[in-house]
Every structure is written in structure tokens, then in C-alpha cells.
Regions:
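Residue(s) in the substrate-gating loop at a strand-loop-helix junction
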Residues: 134
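C-terminal substrate-recognition "lid" of short-chain dehydrogenase/reductases
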Residues: 170, 203-231, 236-237
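Active-site helix of classical SDR
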Residues: 115, 150, 158
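Substrate-binding pocket helix/loop in short-chain dehydrogenase/reductase
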Residues: 91-92, 99-101, 194
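Active-site loop immediately N-terminal to the catalytic Tyr-X3-Lys motif
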Residues: 93, 139-145, 167, 201, ...
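Short C-terminal tail/terminal secondary-structure segment
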Residues: 2-4, 139, 225-248
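Alpha-helical segment proximal to the catalytic Tyr-Lys
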Residues: 120, 163-167, 222
Length: 248
């Protein structure tokens, strides 16, 4: 069996957070592959070449309604790439419960609602799910306590999903980007900090992250399941330091 063969049919794909920079790039990559794509987002559509459906991932009824509309438009569902989420910065000692719960409601519970809804629609024919998290769920960064907890929780959930859904031919993986260009790093100081911390000496391009998301839903990744794939230039596994130079 050749697992590197191209996809034999047009896949029917849903991208949540598709109006954002990364989600929009993922949609472009899926369309280039030949997929039929629907965009789900809380914000207005950014493009007219795919159907767009309003969704609030913090509301279960909204998620179910959006998926019903999208799967009706696509006439089925093969692929879910969940890229919806929010990020806020607050030092641990200043973080209050309301802010923490708000991030969990969107990032963790939102991912649960979306993934469970999609999984139920995939039970008969199988499917491929990619949940977009962040390397913040794997490393400690100042001010990201609630965000890191929410994203780390999604990764743990995905592993259990992979274990439970494999018998239904549903693969579940996690994509954990590091710092990404394309309008996602408006603070030049923050951007430079990530560049300095990254062994690759730069941040990721949107297309690089979208390419990995697309790969994880391809036939070539048919034996990849329950994994967290970091797209971060090595920052989560390689620590940069300047080796002292001995005086001459």
C-alpha cells in the first residue's frame, strides 16, 4: 500500500477560525489541494470563494447549527481543522477567575464542542481532525498562564480522542505553531524576541503552518494519529544560548 498516494477524491473540509490570518491561509491550502471547503467563524467572511457560516464556539447550540449548515452545503464532512481561538496576556498573580474561565470557554471547551460535533458526523465514514493549539501549551512564557492551560488541555483531549475514535477510522492530531508572521505579531519587540529565541532565526510564515495542517489531513499522513506537531523552528525543543568565547 502506498501511503504517499495523492488524495483519490475531493475532500469535504471545514475550517473554524477561517476568517483569521492562519485559518484563511489554511483554506487557501485546502482549496489548492482540491478540497471543497466551508469556513466557520465568529467574524465576517474575508473571502467569497467558500461558503461562510457564523459560529460562536463558546455556545454549543451555535456550533451544532453551524455544522449542520456547513455539512449540508458540502454534502458531508471528511476533514475538520479547528483554528478558532483567542489569546490574552495577564501575569499569573494578576489573573482573575473570570478571565481564566473566558479563555477556557473559547479555547478548551470550544475545541471540545467543535471536535465532538465533527466526530459524530464522521462516525460512519471516518475522517481527519486537526486541532490547532500553540507551543504555549508546551513551554512556559510570561503572561500566558490561562492561554497555556487552555491549549495544553486541547492537546491532552486530542490524545484521548485519538485513542477512542481510531476504531471509527477518525484520526486526530494537534498542530502547535510557534510565532507566526502575517499580521499575527503586531508588536515588533515581541516579534524580535521570538526571532532571537528561535534556532531558525525567524518566525514562521503562514503558508508553512497551513502546509503542515494540510499534510496532516492527507493520505500521506494516514498513519499519524494522536500526535502534537510543533511548527516553531525548534524553539520548543532547542534552547538557544551564546557559548562564551575564550579570550585569546
Amino acid at each position: 500500500m502506498n501511503n504517499l498516494r495523492p488524495t483519490s477524491r475531493r475532500l469535504k473540509s471545514i475550517v473554524t477560525g477561517g476568517a483569521g490570518a492562519l485559518g484563511n491561509s489554511i483554506i487557501s491550502a485546502l482549496l489548492q489541494r482540491g478540497d471543497q471547503v466551508a469556513c466557520l467563524d465568529l467574524n465576517p467572511a474575508q473571502r467569497s470563494d467558500v461558503p461562510h457560516f457564523h459560529v460562536n464556539v463558546a455556545d454549543g447550540a451555535s456550533v451544532r447549527a453551524a455544522f449542520e449548515q456547513a455539512t449540508c452545503a458540502l454534502d458531508g464532512l471528511d476533514v475538520l481543522i479547528h483554528a478558532a481561538g483567542v489569546m490574552r496576556t495577564s501575569p499569573f498573580l494578576d489573573l482573575d477567575e473570570i478571565e481564566f474561565e473566558e479563555l477556557l470557554a473559547v479555547n478548551l471547551l470550544g475545541a471540545f464542542r467543535v471536535a465532538q460535533t465533527a466526530s459524530k458526523l464522521m462516525l460512519e465514514n471516518g475522517g481527519r481532525i486537526v486541532l490547532v493549539t500553540s507551543i504555549h501549551g508546551q513551554i512556559g512564557v510570561h503572561g500566558r498562564c490561562a492561554y497555556a492551560a487552555s491549549k495544553g488541555g486541547v492537546a491532552s483531549m486530542a490524545r484521548v480522542m485519538a485513542a477512542e475514535l481510531s476504531h471509527s477510522r477518525i484520526r486526530v492530531n494537534v498542530l502547535a505553531p510557534g510565532a507566526v508572521d502575517g499580521g499575527m505579531l503586531p508588536d515588533p519587540n515581541a516579534r524580535q524576541g521570538w526571532v532571537k529565541a528561535t534556532p531558525s532565526n525567524r518566525v514562521a510564515y503562514l503558508e508553512e503552518v497551513a502546509g503542515v495542517a494540510t499534510m496532516l489531513t492527507s493520505e500521506g499522513a494516514s498513519f499519524v494519529n494522536g500526535q502534537v506537531i510543533a511548527v516553531d523552528g525548534g524553539v520548543s525543543t532547542v534552547r538557544r544560548f551564546e557559548e562564551p568565547v575564550a579570550p585569546k
